[in-house]
């Protein structure tokens, strides 16, 4: 069966960079996307962000490591931990890291509405707050009749 809805690459307008921002189990749809040829054919850089409470909740580490090994110059993985600290992860929450620039700094890539498309999947509060943080930077929700730079799905 062919995936449908808005959280599929068929619905993403042309962009140079693809940012995939997830919390918890919202990571799943993005791994499905990353395990196809399409993102690597369409985008110069892909950034996968996964936010959870503790390191034990960081899922699919082998799958993500395999993607990073296959696309070392084009793929960045940024884990977030909200309830404990680790050198390899950003602390706190995704929307705040968008606002204060930590997300871009860790990715080594600017979050620019002229170049990027952002897909959000996960906790409804993260989706809403990240959408607001991105809107403050000129990003708009993508609609079929009004192309924008943000696609989203709450996944709780």
Functional labels for PLM-detected ranges:
Residues 15, 38-46:
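Conserved S-adenosyl-L-methionine
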Residues 18-21, 119:
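Conserved beta-strand elements of the Class I
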Residues 23-29:
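Ser/Thr-glycine-rich phosphate-binding loops at phosphate-binding pockets of nucleotides
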Residues 9-12, 39, 108-111:
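Glycine-rich helix-loop-beta junction characteristic of Rossmann-like nucleotide cofactor-binding loops
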Residues 29-39:
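Histidine-anchored nucleotide/phosphate-binding helix
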Residues 1-19, 36, 82, 137, ...:
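FAD-binding FR-type
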Residues 31, 47-50:
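Extended, folded domain segments that form the structural surfaces/walls around functional sites
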Residues 49, 54-156:
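Reductase modules of NAD(P)H-dependent flavoproteins
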